[in-house]
Design a protein with these regions (language model features):
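Structural helix-boundary/capping segments
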Residues: 33-60, 68, 106-151
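Serine-dependent amide/ester hydrolase catalytic core
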Residues: 2-106
């Protein structure tokens, strides 16, 4: 491993295992396990084929939207940011709070989140900017404008 975290081991397999054990938080490990289970024998055909179809349909819908709009805006999360460490032992809340980012992740289009004001609890509100493929410069311009407007 020449980039990122590297945890030593007596051989390559042990090094990879140690690095992944130390480098991934509990939430990432849970999601990897869920994905592995869903794609395991008996579930692959039931879920993977349907997921590919949904992904294709979503991508087509996004392309249609980009014919009318330069970028799309959405909340990044259904609520404000949590205080550091506040929800680490609540996996369902952690999962639900990135629900707004799933469409952009599925279609593989550029997306980013920027802070846009604060909620009544004083915590930041995130707005997600989604752009067509290869239109990152437009996305960055919108992000900059939103950040300037919210200061």
């Amino acid at each position: 491993v020449r980039y990122g975290l590297r945890v030593d081991g007596s051989n390559l397999e042990e090094m990879n295992s140690n690095t992944r054990t130390e480098g991934f938080g509990d939430e990432v490990k849970r999601r990897i396990m869920l994905g592995t289970y869903a794609l395991s024998a008996g579930y692959y055909d039931a879920y993977y084929g349907k997921a590919l179809k949904v992904r294709r349909l979503l991508a087509e819908n996004f392309i249609d939207l980009y014919q009318k709009y330069d970028v799309l805006l959405s909340p990044t999360s259904p609520c404000t940011a949590f205080k550091l460490g506040e929800k680490v032992n609540d996996p369902m809340t952690m999962y639900v709070n990135d629900i707004c980012t799933i469409p952009s992740n599925l279609v593989g289009h550029p997306a980013m989140s920027v802070p846009f004001g604060k909620g009544s609890n004083g915590m930041p509100i995130g707005v997600q900017i989604l752009a067509p493929p290869m239109q990152e410069p437009v996305m960055y311009q919108v992000a900059h404008a939103l950040e300037m407007a919210s200061e």
